[in-house]
Design a protein with these regions (language model features):
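Acidic, mature catalytic/reactive cores of soluble proteins
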Residues: 1-170
Length: 170
């Protein structure tokens, strides 16, 4: 997970330190104007779901060479291994919360997406052992979401575990 970053500069920069430009005003005078992005080094567990969704689309729509499939399969295994290690941990979520990490339901859902798409890729590549193992872990994530992310009182999934705030991303 440490080798993955949630964003990069346009030229591939890894360090995107945020700074305020006090001499500038934004749209309709809004302040502060910032360059960079303080979230560049945040932990946002949802990114792996997006990556695996794209990889799944690739396998469905582009035949690729044997070598390309082998390279992509290696990437898939790395991503899934990363998700195994992080899905139980809090993160900053797509909301880029600056002050504390939480168990964001959307992040958990996207970790489930990552494993679900990993299962599909394993199926395409006829890797039944991975398919079975990854489905079991995906089912654990789903069970955790249903147990901790649903609030019976408001009849909705919430932004984070133990919250009463509905999440517009869900």
């Amino acid at each position: 997970g440490d080798s993955f970053q949630i964003m990069y500069g346009i030229n591939g920069e890894r360090k995107l330190t945020e700074e305020i430009l006090p001499h500038l005003a934004g749209y309709e005078g809004s302040l502060p104007v910032r360059v960079g992005n303080a979230a560049y080094d945040q932990k946002q567990n949802d990114i792996f779901g997006y990556l695996m969704n794209i990889i799944d689309y690739y396998f469905l729509n582009f035949p690729g060479t044997v070598g390309e499939k082998e390279e992509m399969w290696e990437v898939v295994r790395i991503i899934v291994k990363t998700v195994y290690g992080i899905w139980r941990l809090p993160d900053r979520g797509i909301w880029e919360i600056r002050n504390e990490e939480k168990h964001f339901v959307f992040s958990k859902v996207m970790c489930w997406v990552a494993l679900d798409r990993g299962v599909r890729v394993a199926s395409y590549l006829k890797q039944p052992d991975y398919e079975v193992a990854w489905r079991k872990e995906a089912d654990k994530i789903k069970e955790d979401i249903m147990l901790n992310g649903w609030n019976e009182e408001i009849q909705s999934f919430t932004q984070s575990y133990d919250s009463t705030h509905a999440d517009s991303s869900l």
